[in-house]
Regions:
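Acidic-enriched, low-complexity/disordered segments with a strong bias for Aspartate over Glutamate
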Residues: 6, 26-29, 54, 70
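An amphipathic, aromatic/His-enriched active-site/gating alpha helix that lines ligand/cofactor pockets
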Residues: 34-37, 41-46, 64-98
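Residue-level signal for secondary-structure boundary sites
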Residues: 23-25, 69-71, 104
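Short, well-ordered beta-strand segments in beta-rich or mixed alpha/beta enzyme
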Residues: 11-18, 47-77
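Alpha-helical interaction segments
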Residues: 24-25, 35, 52-55, 60-62, ...
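Residue-level signal for functionally critical sites in structured catalytic/ligand-binding pockets
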Residues: 13-15, 27, 42
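Short, surface-exposed ligand-recognition loops at beta-strand->loop->(often short) alpha-helix junctions
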Residues: 18-31
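Glycine-rich beta-strand-turn "strand-cap" elements at beta-sheet edges
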Residues: 1-11, 18, 49-56, 84-105
Length: 105
């Protein structure tokens, strides 16, 4: 389970996916499978959470990694490149953004 902690020195990645309600569940299932079967087993993975809005038009993925390079290496694996091509067909687009924890209240 992700924990947002002041002083976390790892890499936080928040990815938003935009889709239609017609593809929302299929996309969520693909993301859940990717985490269960591949991502959580990658070096440097700390934790992640998947969230869907009530209109089923957006998914937000919050993930934590020990280092930026660990996240980038996961994206470059053959398995994730193949999975991301499929994921891309189920959404209008997705955008991963790297963040640093600045404050926790």
């Amino acid at each position: 389970m992700p924990q947002i902690l002041d002083g976390f020195t790892g890499q936080t990645v928040i990815t938003t996916f935009e889709m239609t309600p017609a593809t929302a569940q299929d996309l969520m299932e693909k993301l859940e499978a990717a985490y269960e079967q591949v991502i959580r087993h990658q070096p440097g993975f700390v934790a992640a959470g998947l969230h869907m809005n009530d209109a089923m038009t957006r998914i937000c993925n919050y993930s934590q990694w020990q280092r930026r390079e660990d996240y980038q290496a996961m994206l470059r694996t053959v398995e994730m490149r193949e999975r991301n091509r499929v994921i891309n067909t189920l959404c209008k687009g997705f955008e991963p953004v790297m963040y640093e924890v600045i404050g926790v209240y």
